[in-house]
């Protein structure tokens, strides 16, 4: 077994250069990333391979699964621009994976699946499962998994934390409900991981129960929730609702500080932490 972090983001040097060369969102201005939802200061050193491997050692993580966060807005670009940036990220990521001595695995950002353990998509894409079907069929054929991440989007006149606290959870709740409504029955064996506890899925299941839905019918052993950005109370509720076998550890490094979530997971004791960080995510990997 391997201690795994299923939710990290890593920008290859060529991708950083490509963002720095742009003048429309998403782009980099020095160490500030300019997105449709605002401007955010970054420490670009967090995307250096050596520093990332040191962070894995610090957290006791043996393998990190890295993806390109859909919140930067590539899905809102013209197809040609998006495809160019995706290709740069995927090629650079495969090079980093090859250089990391087995410490990294990658998720496709929408290009080729070759060399990747799965694919990451934005939450909004689950609103049109027919359009997503070719990717889902191919993932199922390969025995790979789908990772659903918040899509993000432009916001105006809101504080910097607005998207993370209001937009992302709502998007993930909608994605989770879209999957329950139309995806699960079509791809019942495809492993699907919803980031950030699907935006608070247990609360939504209680709402479903008030509408006459048998909550037990919504629990599926191919659907997983990652723990990124949450602490003990939220994780405990998910364990009570879904069972510990459906939770996987995610940190959202370098976007979020991993320490609070990691501390919460470890606080449940060795057996629970072993399931969330080791047994469950390992089931998703080839």
Locations of regions flagged by a protein language model:
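Active-site gating loops and adjacent loop-to-helix segments of metal-dependent hydrolytic enzymes
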Residues: 9-46, 77, 83, 153-169, ...
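Catalytic pocket-lining loop regions of alpha/beta-barrel enzymes
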Residues: 115-248
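Short glycine-enriched loops at secondary-structure junctions
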Residues: 69, 110-112, 150-154, 254-255
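Long, low-complexity, intrinsically disordered polar/charged segments
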Residues: 27-30, 34-35, 112-125
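Hydrophobic/aromatic residues located in beta-strands of well-ordered beta-sheets
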Residues: 3, 64, 104-106, 146, ...
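Mid-to-C-terminal alpha-helical segments outside catalytic/metal-binding sites
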Residues: 1-6, 12-63, 91-98, 200-201, ...
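Charged helix-capping and loop-helix junction motifs
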Residues: 82-89, 128-134
